[in-house]
């Protein structure tokens, strides 16, 4: 367990939270609608002032000078056009709306776009991963080279292993949570494998006898007897999987 915890500590993963950036009103680019509304508003104000001026000049100077008669017609026309532009800018583009209405309308899209929570960034892996406003649960699998498989009792294995076979008890096998690994029961330096190698060397050394047919029959019988006695049992007999 100490080695496993040490390997987990060696895995470098840095997690830090990042507060989401809320764009200010200065960073928001002016849209085309705002430009058109502002243009209509100032044009309407200018035309309205010119229309008022022409109307006043026509009514004042009309009595003495006859060439100011056109101002009485042009002044009201310019004034009506200017008022129309102002109404379009106010009603359609909302250029003169109240400040509280604007703030309430700006808060609704910001609350919809802004994630509701901090952001978590993982930087100790191949590619950084960022989670916005979500509950992050980190899971690191255990290392593969653990000293002992989980759920295997070494004293139980030592008590049931014998040179020519394995004696299992039903209660102990049922109590195990997971099947034992084959290499833990029969390692490479087991006596069964050593005897098998001795049998193979013995059969190789007996190939120089004068009668090959009789020697092959005897060697085959000896090899079958030795393998039947010292070879490890199959995995299905060691641990039967539940059906």
From Swiss-Prot:
GO terms for cellular component: apical plasma membrane; endoplasmic reticulum membrane. It is a multi-pass membrane protein. Disulfide bonds: none annotated. Pfam families: TMEM174 (PF15029). It is found in: Endoplasmic reticulum membrane; Apical cell membrane. Predominantly expressed in kidney. Selectively localized in the apical membrane of renal proximal tubule epithelial cells. GO terms for biological process: phosphate ion homeostasis. Keywords: Cell membrane, Endoplasmic reticulum, Membrane, Transmembrane, Transmembrane helix. It comes from the Eukaryota. Interacts with SLC34A1; regulates SLC34A1 internalization by PTH and FGF23. Regulator of plasma phosphate homeostasis. Decreases serum inorganic phosphate (Pi) uptake by regulating the sodium-phosphate cotransporter SLC34A1 trafficking by PTH and FGF23 in the kidney. This is Transmembrane protein 174. The gene is TMEM174.
């Amino acid at each position: 367990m100490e080695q496993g915890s040490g390997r987990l500590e060696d895995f470098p993963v840095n997690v830090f939270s990042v507060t989401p950036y809320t764009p200010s009103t200065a960073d928001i680019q002016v849209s085309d609608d705002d430009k058109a509304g502002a243009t209509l508003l100032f044009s309407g104000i200018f035309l309205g002032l010119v229309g008022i001026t022409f109307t006043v000049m026509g009514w004042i100077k009309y009595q003495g000078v006859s060439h100011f008669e056109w101002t009485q017609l042009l002044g009201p026309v310019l004034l009506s056009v200017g008022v129309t532009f102002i109404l379009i800018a106010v009603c359609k583009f909302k250029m003169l709306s109240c400040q509280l209405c604007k703030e309430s309308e700006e808060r609704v899209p910001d609350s919809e776009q802004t994630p509701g929570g901090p952001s978590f960034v993982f930087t100790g892996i191949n590619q950084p991963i960022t989670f916005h406003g979500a509950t992050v649960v980190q899971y690191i699998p255990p290392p593969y080279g653990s000293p002992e498989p989980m759920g295997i009792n070494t004293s139980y294995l030592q008590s049931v292993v014998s040179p020519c076979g394995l004696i299992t008890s039903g209660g102990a096998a049922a109590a195990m949570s997971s099947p034992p690994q084959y290499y833990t029961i029969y390692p490479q330096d087991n006596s069964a494998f050593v005897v098998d190698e001795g049998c193979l060397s013995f059969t190789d050394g007996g190939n120089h006898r004068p009668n090959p047919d009789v020697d092959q029959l005897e060697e085959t019988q000896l090899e079958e007897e030795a393998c039947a006695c010292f070879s490890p049992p199959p995995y299905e007999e060691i641990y039967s999987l539940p059906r």
